Amino acid sequence: KGISEAKGDIIAFIDDDDYVSTTYLQEMQSLTTGDNIVICYPYAFNDGHPEQQLPYRITNAYNQCVGKSHISINSMARKFFSGPCMKLIPASYIGEKRFDLRFKNGEDSLFMFFISNQIKTISITKQNAIYYRRYRSNSANFSTNIKQRFYNALRLISEYTRIYFTHIQEYNFIFFFTRILGSIRSIINP
């Protein structure tokens, strides 16, 4: 429902467990052109210990992308597209597309794949636009057993495949393939 209620030309998603720096929106908006996605600096921490930054694959991706003049969805930036947070997205990219609520896990990644056919350019902020990603031990990502993860991954792979092959000319094969690999990885490593 939140997407339908959003007003304006760009949308920022912030998970209810997470928070952002005071300059987050201002810094992100300063790079918005209307047809680009803007990504920021991700800072991961365990609940109750925000002063201790955790190693985080998306922070590593940020460090590899920052300072580059051209950032592609096939670059390390693809790690940012496992979910809608940590970025500003043009509302036009989303249109009538919505999260698939049949999925308890993976719906964020599926949504981002669904809108990936719209991605033209990616811009990256300086490190002071921070998205603080909080890890909680009781998060939905940690609560499913292997049988549930396997079933969910199969359903996700099926949906990625349906979207890709229905509009094969619009979607990037490498990005599609990395979503399939990510779904398989989620079975073993939640």
Walk through the language-model features, giving the residues of each.
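Glycine-rich, basic loop-to-helix element that forms the pyrophosphate-binding segment
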Residues: 1-6
